[in-house]
Amino acid sequence: MTTRGLICSALLGASALAATSIATPASAQRVDNIVAFGDSYADDGNLFQIIGFNPAPQVYPTGRFSGGTNYIDTLSSLLDVPVENFAIGGALTDNTNTNGPGIPGFITEWNAFLGGGGGPFPTVSGTFDENDLVTFSIGGNDARFYQQTGGTLTGAPTAAAVSAATAKVGLDSLVAAGAHNISFLAGNTAILPEIAANPSAQAIRNAYSTNFNAAMQDVLAGYAADGVMVHYLDLTLVGEQITANPAAYGFTNTGACTPAPQCVTDSAYANQFLFYVDALHLTSAGFRIVGEYIATQLQAPLTLGAPGELGLDTASQFGRTLSSRVDLGSPRDGDVSEGMKVFVVGDTFSHDVEVTAATDKFDIDGTGITVGATYGFGTGVVGIAGNYSRPRAKFIGDISRTESDTWQIGGFGGFAIAGAFAQAYLGYGWDDLDIRRQGVVENMRADTNGDHWLAGAKAGFLFPVGIMRAGPVVAIDYAKANVDDYTETGDPALTLNVDSTSAKSLVGGIGAELRGDFDTSGVSVRPYLSAMLEKELANGSRTLHFSQTSAPGIVNSWALGDRADGLYGRISGGGSAQILNGVTLNTVLSTTVGRDNGNDVSGQLGVNVGF
């Protein structure tokens, strides 16, 4: 089929898919394919195929308008995924083109996709799957063409509204075809070097671009509200960051490359400049920066669940500390509990959180110190404790980390009569969170607060087994962590507003416990070992809401999914030893085995002093 025949077929034959509401949070950010729409910032040679330029002009030898690669190429390389490219250089939001009459625009692009592609475009199914990233760089030519053809400053808002409405028709159709993940470039052609000396042209283009981008934010906000993941990149902010610190981005000049012969033939020289020789497009190096910004945006949701998980793990560790104060003392150790004791416990814990569809792999670890007191009354004991901990969550490659200063208080109690025992704990904690994310050059940071609750109970019956005691045990442990909303500081093109969120866990367990009581050289040693089968009983699903600070109306919903609820094992062991009159040293080690969301390991070392 000829190129022109393909275009006509696409326009006439593509199905008009009705817009549908997704109505559920986005759940896929694992990109395995890029589908590109737009103009010369994304085009990989489609324009030259359509108009019959083969080979491409010398100034654009690769078919890209940078003389080398564009941001789609960079993104494809960073994500290691293929590209289906429908962008046409010079495309306007309608079906016209700045390069001349009869050359198609955005309408042809999206209709060609829905019609299955072919001709200058790749052959496709006409629908998207949940791991496709759909990119748009459209609207810049509308502003540029409007100014170049005599458009006025007063007429710019109305003209921009028409362009935005036209673009919306195409975006609506593509969302209806299943687009789940959108990346939208928001440019402003007023800042291009080609009109650097023309303030009148700058004013007209700026008015047009500002109104167009605002209208597109409203359109994109509607998709995000229906569950589509929308990443909005403000290229003006990116340009301001580069201009403020060009050397950090690898540039010696933020203007257009000159002289032209050297720029076209020497890519290393051209890439010292932000803009290419045409004063309109970025160099390959400039486009590389844009691709890196988008990749950083795509990474962000995969890190947002860590603060909540950190709060849960910190709460759970304090729960183990409180519970161990009963496990390691009288009357659980078989002795009679009398009077007051004070204790100091140091603890550490670690949890390797496995990668999922909603989060990248990260490690949680922390250390803490707990001080408290117990009071025993024969077959029972009660106690209180205060804790300070320094937990952190760190992603592989340090792409993001959350550090916390945490204060916790809690109470516990238990009794043991003959072989029967029961114990429980309750606690609360305050978290002072420092959240950091890696940027392209400047990183992002936020300080916020959180809190958490913890509670648990355990009961069982131990039978005499020779010189030991053993028997069945059941347990339940609950934790809930809240993280307040926060706004990041740092690179304004990447900073986020993140809404408050909460995470919860309810773990049930059943197993067996073995205890002993030995005297060795006058030292009383009382070890124990516990083996449990545990299972997450709470649904634990949660949805995070966030937006770019540059486009706060586009609020994305990110579903983290249910917590892993498969059976897993937990082995705990420890003991106490009386080292001086009224002074006991105690220790506990605990680890999970076969847990789907990553195993945790913890340890405690403490000393009790009785009065």
Tell where the protein language model's regions lie, with residue ranges.
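Residue-level signature of transmembrane alpha-helix interfaces in integral membrane proteins
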Residues: S21, Q49, N54-P55, E194, ...
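Membrane translocator/pore-forming domains, dominated by Gram-negative outer-membrane beta-barrels
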Residues: S337-F611
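Conserved active-site regions of diverse hydrolases
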Residues: S27-D335, G346-V355, V371
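Short, functionally important structural connectors and interaction interfaces within domains
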Residues: R4, S9, A14, Q272-L274, ...
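Gram-negative bacterial Sec-dependent N-terminal signal peptides
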Residues: M1-A28
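Amphipathic, positively biased hydrophobic alpha-helical segments used for protein targeting
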Residues: T20-S21, Q49, F53, G150, ...
